[in-house]
Each structure stands twice: as C-alpha cells, then as structure tokens.
C-alpha cells in the first residue's frame, strides 16, 4: 500500500492487453461509454483515456480522462506511423473510420524521473543537466513534465519531472534502453522506480 501518485513507468505494446481483454473492453467499456454519452445528449468527439485495472473478475475502470494518458502517450505516439495531425483532423471531421492506424513493429518503454519526496513534499527549482545527450539519438526521447525555464536554465518544477522514453525490438530491450537513458539526465533530487516493469522481462 502507498499514496496515490502518477504513473512512473509505462510500456507499449502491453503483453497483458490480450485479445480477450481487448474484445471485452470494446464491447462492455469503450462502446458502452461512448453510447451512454450520446444517449445523454452529450456525444463525445476527441480523446478518451480509459484507466483500466486487470482483476480476477475482469477489467475494471479506474478513471476516465478526456486527453491522452501521461505518460502513456509517450510510448504509444512514438510508435505510431500515421501523421497525428491527419488523425486528429479525421477525429474532428467524424471520419476516423477512414483512418487505418499503423504502429511500428517494435516496443517502447518510458521511465519517469521524479523529484525525491513525491507525491508528498519535494523541492523545486533544481537545475537539470544532460539534455544534450539526447541529440541525434534515434529512438530516444526526453519528454518534459514538471520543468520550467528560469534564469537561462531548465529547472525542476513538479513531482514528475521528465519522461525518458526509448524504443527497442522487444519490451525487454526497450526497458533496458530506457533505464540506460535515465543516466543521461541529472538533477540533485532525482528519483525513479526500478521495480516497476520487471514483469515484462518474463512476459
């Protein structure tokens, strides 16, 4: 047990999201949600993030967000081959059925670098170093979250500071690459989880 906090590690594709889970969710979660909003006179057009937990009794919905998941999008979007602008325009125009979403045949893992003490009490305004290490590194990404530009440098400004994403041919390789890339960034109170995502090594 612990305090509720934002996601610290995420990966794509998920070996736990099986065809059976997908079929169940499409029938009883995704479509039901959209149909219910339309029936209430509030048809939804946009992004819905479904926060799911897999249980012995099947998938359970923990939360909805009317946006991409953070940091979930940081492993999904880098693998998407489509132009995201075209996808969003199709969404706005009601023509998503004409879009064939395609994803790279690889994997991506994102490790969140947090401020030590998060989600309770943590220091802000600490200089962050190492962004130059990501230059010209294909398949590696550094996504900003709790940061700001102050006095000519980038400093921490939140609990979840950066999302470090890396690709790999497999989830195991992507996880290894992502954790290696976390060492490229340094700030005084940097903290990250090492135990989350280990299940993908055996998946």
Residue ranges of each PLM-predicted region?
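Active-site "cap" helix and flanking loop/linker of ATP-utilizing ligase/carboxylase catalytic domains
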Residues: 26-48, 65-137, 150
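Glycine-rich phosphate-binding loop of ATP-grasp-fold ATP-dependent ligases
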Residues: 1-21, 71-76
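Short beta-strand elements
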Residues: 1-3, 50-54, 59-68, 146-147
């Amino acid at each position: 047990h612990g305090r509720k906090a934002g996601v610290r590690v995420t990966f794509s594709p998920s070996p736990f999201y099986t065809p059976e889970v997908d079929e169940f969710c499409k029938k009883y979660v995704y479509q039901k949600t959209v149909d219910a909003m339309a029936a209430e006179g509030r048809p939804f057009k946009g992004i819905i993030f479904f926060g799911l937990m897999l249980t012995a009794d099947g998938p359970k919905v923990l939360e909805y967000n009317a946006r991409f998941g953070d940091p979930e999008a940081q492993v999904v979007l880098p693998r998407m081959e489509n132009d995201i602008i075209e996808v969003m325009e199709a969404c706005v125009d009601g023509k998503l059925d004409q879009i064939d979403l395609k994803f790279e045949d690889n994997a991506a893992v994102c490790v969140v670098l947090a401020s030590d003490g998060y989600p309770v009490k943590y220091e802000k305004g600490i200089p962050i170093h190492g962004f130059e290490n990501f230059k010209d590194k294909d398949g590696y990404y550094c996504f900003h979250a709790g940061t700001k530009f102050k006095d000519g440098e980038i400093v921490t400004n939140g609990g979840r500071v950066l999302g470090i994403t890396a690709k790999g041919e497999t989830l195991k390789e992507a996880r290894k690459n992502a954790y290696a890339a976390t060492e490229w960034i340094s700030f005084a109170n940097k903290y990250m989880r090492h135990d989350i995502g280990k299940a993908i090594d055996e998946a």
